[in-house]
Amino acid sequence: MKRVGFLTSGGDCQALNATMRGVAKGLYQIYKDEVEIIGFEDGYKGLMYANYLMMKQSDFSGVLTKGGTMLGTSRQPFKLMRVPDENGLDKVELMKHTYYKLKLDALVVLGGNGSQKTANLLSQEGLNVIGLPKTIDNDLWGTDMTFGFQSAVDIATNAIDCIHTTASSHGRVFICLLYTSPSPRDGA
């Protein structure tokens, strides 16, 4: 029996559910009934505190076009991963404990820069981790395009097209602010 954990971490974006569905579908095709998928709720928090769902094939039905993440997400700053809690355990030790307690064969992490840094740290600790790059900023080093980016561009373009029509009709100017974070590519 193979046991694979899924978690989504950091900001929300389109295609999280679709990506998990694609990975799950591949696992079920290869391993049939010999695979268990464990979904960690609220990102790395779920892995730290063993908050998880035993997922079934049916959990991945009907999610292809749904945005967001069925598992929930949270932000866990990378720089705090090694800070001990009140019991003297750092977050990495808590995550390793859950990983080994659940006898995972691999952990699939869907996340951006900080989430992938943590995934790399867990890999350096001996865990089998697969990092799937996700960000609407498209600023992850080593990738041409991250999932989430094109959806964000398409939605923003559509909204701006609609606003342009209204602005033209009423002789007004609109200023549109789109969320992004400083990019390492920009020297930030």
Which functions belong to the PLM regions below?
Residues 5, 29-31, 61-65, 98-102, ...:
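Solvent-exposed alpha-helices and their adjacent loops that cap or buttress functional pockets
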Residues 123-146, 150-153:
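Short, acidic/small-residue loops that bind anionic groups at enzyme active sites
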Residues 3-13, 70-72, 105-109, 174-177:
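Short glycine-rich or small-residue beta-strand-to-loop segments that form or flank ligand, phosphate
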Residues 19, 23, 113-127:
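Short Gly/Thr/Asp-enriched flexible loops that form oxyanion-binding sites at enzyme active sites
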Residues 50-107, 147-161:
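Glycine-rich oxoanion-binding loops at beta->alpha junctions
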Residues 1-48:
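N-terminal phosphate-binding or glycine-rich loops at protein starts, especially the Walker A/P-loop
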Residues 179-188:
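Single conserved hydrophobic/aromatic residue that forms the stacking wall/gate
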Residues 9-12, 40-45, 75-76, 112-115, ...:
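Short, ordered loop/turn segments at secondary-structure junctions
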